[in-house]
Amino acid sequence: MLCEQVLGKLHDFDTTGKTIEYVDIEWHEAFKKIHKKITDKGTEVGIRMDDSILARGLYQDDVIYADDEKLVVVNTPPCEVIRVSLTSGHEKMSAKVCYEIGNRHAPLFWGENDTFITIYNEPMLVMLQKIHGVQAEKEVLKLDFDKRISASINNHHH
């Protein structure tokens, strides 16, 4: 099966009587044009997107295949992240947190209750824990790309 475009979001489709198959696209794969994957129901899927995917990405609940019987839908699995919160009275440290995360080209998301979320790596966690007035904890959660702060999301390292 070949999937070549994002057809919309799952909530936009009538799913009555249709099988929904999910294909896992990790956060760092979301902006790649070509994938070879297997859905949760065992269907082999080739994904070949056009250049627009380099800017848009593949996100949770994107429908990439639809026919009368089946939908193939993107699932973004949970991943290790760092949840960053600011101690009361140290709200201005948000500028330092955002600068340090951005300087490392790491993706940044809004979290719940005035927190920030970034992808986990040990050096980042250690660095954030050393900033006065900042609490940083490792967690596993599903990224919400609608809450991204970063202009781009990629797996870029120096």
Segments from the language model and where they lie:
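Short glycine-/aliphatic-rich beta-strand segments at the starts of folded cytosolic domains
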Residues: 73-87
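Short, surface-exposed secondary-structure boundary micro-motifs
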Residues: 63, 68-69
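Helix-rich terminal scaffold detector
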Residues: 1-20, 41, 114-158
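Short, well-ordered loop/turn sites that connect or cap secondary structure elements
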Residues: 55-58, 64
